[in-house]
Swiss-Prot record:
It comes from Paracoccus denitrificans. InterPro entries: UPF0324_pro (IPR018383). It holds the Pfam family Cons_hypoth698. It is found in: Cell membrane. This is UPF0324 membrane protein TauZ.
Length: 338
């Protein structure tokens, strides 16, 4: 198993040009984000889309772009586990945990039901529903890694990442005002923001725009949603496998549990046991963020902008409906919990 995780020298040489281009795009996106405030994920995706010609067959960069979009992506998701610990659950309380967990499950079920109304398949429903329910772009990339591939897989992933990133940015501005309108306390505002906004960075921005208590609570709630990524991906993988829909190469069945999910769970367990020093956990979080940023740049490079626009209005309506559903559910839940 370990040997399969370590790229051969030939693979490294073939992949380096494409990886280097993806890393350069990611660094550029981060620079622009730091200086102009736009989300780095969104910028990396848009810059990548403009460089689609680098992924065309026969180019030196194509193999590395494909490698980065797949393998580096999985590494980034696995490293997210180092930020998760069981202590987070105890700090929040059972009522809020139940509300967050129910929001994740019901949003995914809503996506599966609503997708039929707009003529979208179950793959697209799991991709968009999971990304809205859990952690935006990171969840979209993790879920895409276990879904059976088809000719529109890359297009659907780019659409989902683009949509949840834009919606997260809008929510970062709008949702704190809604929290004030609903009369939420600082703690409830944090639960609302952390339980509804898609991406971690926008959750932090929205929470601390209200105050320190709201910001800390929002971040904690968001990380608990992130901790549900591995169980949800595992459930998706098991369901797909049970129905005989999983991808297979050379007639060999795919692994029951993807390696990156195992990595996520192992790191989360080690962190829960206090075996991961705070400095290492912080470093793993930074490495994860950069790996995901580089991977989404590669996904953008791989995707044709023309094909992405073929996704249709039904897909846009679906992801908007999922976002509204989650926000309404958490709002009602907070009022019920009092």
């Amino acid at each position: 198993m370990i040997s399969t995780m370590i790229p051969s020298r030939g693979l490294i040489e073939a992949a380096f040009p494409g990886f280097a281009v993806s890393a350069l795009v990611a660094a550029t996106a981060q620079f622009l984000s730091d200086h102009y405030g736009a989300p780095a994920m969104l910028l990396a995706l848009l810059l990548g889309l403009a460089l689609n010609f680098l992924a065309e067959d026969g180019t030196r960069t194509a193999p590395g772009v494909a490698f980065t979009a797949r393998t580096v992506l999985r590494l980034g998701v696995a490293l997210l586990g180092a930020r998760i610990s069981a202590g987070m659950l105890a700090a929040l309380g059972p009522g809020a945990i139940a509300l967050v967990a129910a929001g994740v499950v019901l949003t995914i079920l809503f996506a599966l039901a609503a997708s039929r109304l707009v003529g979208r398949g179950w793959r697209f429903a799991l991709l968009t529903g999971g990304s809205v329910a859990i952690c935006g772009a990171s969840a979209a990339m993790a879920i895409a890694a276990v879904l059976p591939r088809h000719e529109k897989s890359e297009r659907d992933l780019v659409f989902t990442v683009l949509s949840v990133t834009v919606l997260s940015t809008v929510a970062m501005v709008l949702y704190p005002m809604l929290a004030g309108f609903f009369g939420f306390t600082a703690r409830d505002s944090g639960v609302f923001l952390g339980g509804t906004i898609h991406d971690v960075a926008q959750v932090v921005g929205a929470g601390f725009s209200i105050g320190p208590e709201a910001g800390e609570t929002a971040t904690l709630v968001k990380l608990i949603r992130v901790s549900m990524l591995a169980p949800v991906v595992l459930c998706f993988s098991l369901a797909i496998r049970a129905r005989g829909l999983a991808d297979s190469r050379g007639g060999k069945a795919p692994p029951l549990l993807p390696g990156f999910v195992i990595g996520f769970l192992v790191l989360a367990a080690l962190n829960s046991l206090g075996l991961v020093p705070a400095a290492v956990s912080e470093l793993a979080g930074q490495l994860s963020r950069w790996a995901l940023l580089i991977a989404i740049a590669a996904v953008g490079i791989k995707t044709s902008l023309k094909k992405m626009f073929e996704v249709g209005t039904g897909a846009i309506a679906l992801i908007l409906a999922e976002t509204v559903f989650l926000a309404v559910f958490v709002t009602i839940g907070l009022h019920v919990l009092g």
